[in-house]
Amino acid sequence: MDDNKRPLYLPFAGPAILESPLLNKGSAFSEEERIYFNLEGLIPWVIETIDEQAARAYAQFKNFTNDLDKHIYLRNIQDTNETLFYRLVRNNISEMMPIIYTPTVGLACERFSKNYRRNRGLFISYPNKDRIDDILNNSTRHKVKVIVVTDGERILGLGDQGIGGMGIPIGKLSLYTSCGGISPAYCLAVTLDVGTDNPQLLEDPMYMGWRHQRIGGDEYAEFVEEFMQAVSRRWPDALIQFEDFAQKNAMPLLERYKDQYCSFNDDIQGTAAVTVGSLLAACKAANSKLSEQRITFLGAGSAGCGIAEAIVATMVSEGISDQQARSQVFMVDRWGLLLDNMPNLLPFQQKLAQPCATIEAWDNYSDNISLLDVVNNAKPTVLIGVSGSPGLFTEEIIKAMHSHCKRPIVFPLSNPTSRVEATPKDILNWTSGQALVATGSPFEPVIVNGETFEIAQCNNSFIFPGIGLGVLSCGARRVSDEMLMASSRALAECSPLGKDGVGSLLPRLEDIQTVSKYIAFAVAKAAIDQGLALPCTDELLQQSIEANFWEPEYRRYKRTSF
C-alpha cells in the first residue's frame, strides 16, 4: 500500500503539529483532524487542498521582485510546511530551481548570518569535538538516509563562507527531494564549523559561527574522522555526500573515505558524472565518440581533474589505452598548461600533466603555455571551464577553436553566473550557432541567425538525486566509479539532442524526476553487478525505486492517545 494512502498515527496534538515542518498541513487539516488534534481555532475555517495552498503560495512568490527575497520566502515555507514547499517547487521546477539553488543560493550563503531565521540541519563546531555523538542524537531527523556535509571553505566560486555554507547542503537536499523523490524526513544537512579565514566574517558582529581561524592539518583530519565514525554509529546505512570542501581537503577526504563508507564528493564525482554524460550526448549529436575528442580544461583543481579522470576512464571503456586517452587531455591553470616538469604539482594533477617532450615542438613553446597556445597547437574539439574566473573564454580563443573544429563543444561550467568563463550568447555568436554549449548555471535561450538554441544546464542536479535514489533503492554499501559511469551513460541516453537531433543537450528540468528514476535504475544495476548490493530482478528493482520515490502529498493523521 502507498505510504501516502496509509494514515500516520501521532501521539501529540495542538501547536506541536503546526510547528513541525514535516507534519504541518496548515489549512489542509480535515475537520476530523482539527477536532481530534485540538486544532480548532488555531487555523482559519476554510479547508483547502494542497494545490489550492500552492496556488496562493505561488501568487505570493510572484510578488517578490528580487531572487534573494524569493529564496528567503521559499525557505520560510520549507521551514513551516515541507510538503507544501515540495509541491510548490515540483509544480514550478524550472522557475524555482535557480532560486532554491544556483545561482541564488550563493548570495544566500553570503548573507546567511544576516538573514538567519530558523534552525535547519546540524552545526557541529570544533569546540564540541568531544560531543559529536550527542549532537547527532539531537537531530530532529531520526531515520536519516542521506547526509550532505560541508565545511564552508569553498562555496561555489565565492570562497570561504564559514557556516554560511550551510545554504549549500540545505539546497542540495531540497533537490534530492524535489528531483530524486527522497523523503525530506530522511535528509540531513550538516556544517562542520571549523572556523573561517574570511576576515569579513571574523569581523562581522552578526556572524554566527565559531569566530576563529580555520583549523587544519591533523586537527582537521581527526575532527572529520570523529564525525564520520559518529555518523556510522548513528546511521550506519546513510549515504554521505561531501560538498564544497576546499581543494586541499576535497580529494584527500574522497580517497580516504570512498572505500570505507557509502560516500562521494559531488564537486568532484558528481560534476564529473554530469559532464561526462553531457559530453557523451554532445558526441552523439556530432556523430563522433568521446575517445575521438581532444579536450582542454581551464581549471586544474580537484573538480577539473576529477572530470578529466572520469573522461579518461570513459575513453578507455570505448577501447583506447589509458596512455592514449591522457595524451588527448590538456589541463590549463593559472600557471599555464600542466607539464610533467613543473614543481609543486598536486598528486591528482601529476597524472594529467603533459610530457614536456611532446610539447616542445609547439609554436610559442615556453614555461607558461597559455590557453590560446593550447587551442592553437592541440586543436581541441572540447573546451571545459572550471576556473571560477569570468570572461576567460575570449572571442579570440573560441574563434581559434572553431577554425579547426566545425562543431566545437564548449562547456563554461563555473558557478555562479557571475563567474562563467563566457556566456552562451557570445559563444554561439562567435561560432555562428555551430557550438554545442552547456553551462553550470541557468541561461535563457539564445537566438542566432533566427534560430533558437536551448542552453543545457550541466548541473549536478541531473545526477546526484538519481545516484541517491539508486543507492537507497538497492541498499548499496558504496558509491563506485562504475556506478558513476552508469549514471553518465544513463543521462546521455536521456538527451533530446542525442536521441532526436534537435533540442537541448540535456533533458528539460520538467522531466528531471523521470530522468532521476532512469539514472537510479542504472546506478542500482551497476551496484548489484559489482556485488555492492544484494541481487535483485529488474522488476523488483523498479518496484523498489517507485516505492522509495516520495511524492509531496498530505497523509491522513490518526491520534494514538488522548
From Swiss-Prot:
Entry note: cofactor: Divalent metal cations. Prefers magnesium or manganese.
GO process annotations (BP): malate metabolic process
Catalytic activity, EC: 1.1.1.38
InterPro entries membership: Aminoacid_DH-like_N_sf (IPR046346), Malic_enzyme_CS (IPR015884), Malic_N_dom (IPR012301), Malic_N_dom_sf (IPR037062), Malic_NAD-bd (IPR012302), Malic_OxRdtase (IPR001891), NAD(P)-bd_dom_sf (IPR036291), NAD_malic_enz_proteobac (IPR023667)
EC class name: oxidoreductase
Molecular-function annotations in GO: malate dehydrogenase (decarboxylating) (NAD+) activity; metal ion binding; NAD binding; oxaloacetate decarboxylase activity
Keyword terms, alphabetized: Metal-binding, NAD, Oxidoreductase
Needed cofactors: Mg(2+); Mn(2+)
Coiled-coil annotated spans: none
Signal sequence residues: none
Active-site residues, as the UniProt record annotates them: 101, 172
Highest rank taxon of the organism: Bacteria
Chain residues that bind NAD(+): 154, 267, 415
Record site: Important for activity: 267
Oligomer status and interactors: Homotetramer.
Similarity annotation: Belongs to the malic enzymes family.
UniProt-recorded name of the protein: NAD-dependent malic enzyme
Species name: Shewanella frigidimarina (strain NCIMB 400)
